[in-house]
């Protein structure tokens, strides 16, 4: 059976790993998921990510989760735009997540950027998800 929303699956694996206090989670590889993982590293929500392979030889992304004093750094990670309902916003309409403490992941013509950077660049795009 094929997966309907691979990005939502990635977010769920991260959420489940954090609630189980895992050090690493493994996610099936795709370019967009690798880009999202690198984005989360740059924003400071996860420690690291690297491309690996599963025991079956399939490519995967190994994500090292981040904790501060035993508490997960990621309080909330949520998929917004999904295959059945895409959500696009102009730069003026981009939401502030958790009153500016969180970040919206936006797919723009300039690549994957945060809501703050999209506003600075003056570009809108598809809201991939929210992280706080």
From Swiss-Prot:
Statement: the UniProt record of this protein carries the keyword Ribonucleoprotein: yes
Gene Ontology cellular component terms for the protein in this record: ribonucleoprotein complex; ribosome
Keyword Transmembrane: no
GO molecular function: rRNA binding; structural constituent of ribosome
A single GO BP: translation
Keywords of the record: Ribonucleoprotein, Ribosomal protein, RNA-binding, rRNA-binding
Subunit organization: Part of the 30S ribosomal subunit. Contacts proteins S5 and S12.
Family statement: Belongs to the universal ribosomal protein uS8 family.
Function, as annotated: One of the primary rRNA binding proteins, it binds directly to 16S rRNA central domain where it helps coordinate assembly of the platform of the 30S subunit.
Stated name of the protein: Small ribosomal subunit protein uS8
Organism: Francisella tularensis subsp. novicida (strain U112)
Lineage: Bacteria, Pseudomonadati, Pseudomonadota, Gammaproteobacteria, Thiotrichales
């Amino acid at each position: 059976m094929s997966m309907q929303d691979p990005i939502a699956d990635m977010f769920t694996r991260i959420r489940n790993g954090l609630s189980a206090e895992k050090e690493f989670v493994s996610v099936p590889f795709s370019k967009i998921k690798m880009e999202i993982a690198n984005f989360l590293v740059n924003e400071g929500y996860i420690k690291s990510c690297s491309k690996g392979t599963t025991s079956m030889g399939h490519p995967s992304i190994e994500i090292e989760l981040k904790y501060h004093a035993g508490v997960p750094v990621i309080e909330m990670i949520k998929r917004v735009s999904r295959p059945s309902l895409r959500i696009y916003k102009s730069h003026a309409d981009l939401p502030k997540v958790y009153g500016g403490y969180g970040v919206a992941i936006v797919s723009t013509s300039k690549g994957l950027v945060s809501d703050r950077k999209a506003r600075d660049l003056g570009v809108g795009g598809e809201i991939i998800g929210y992280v706080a």
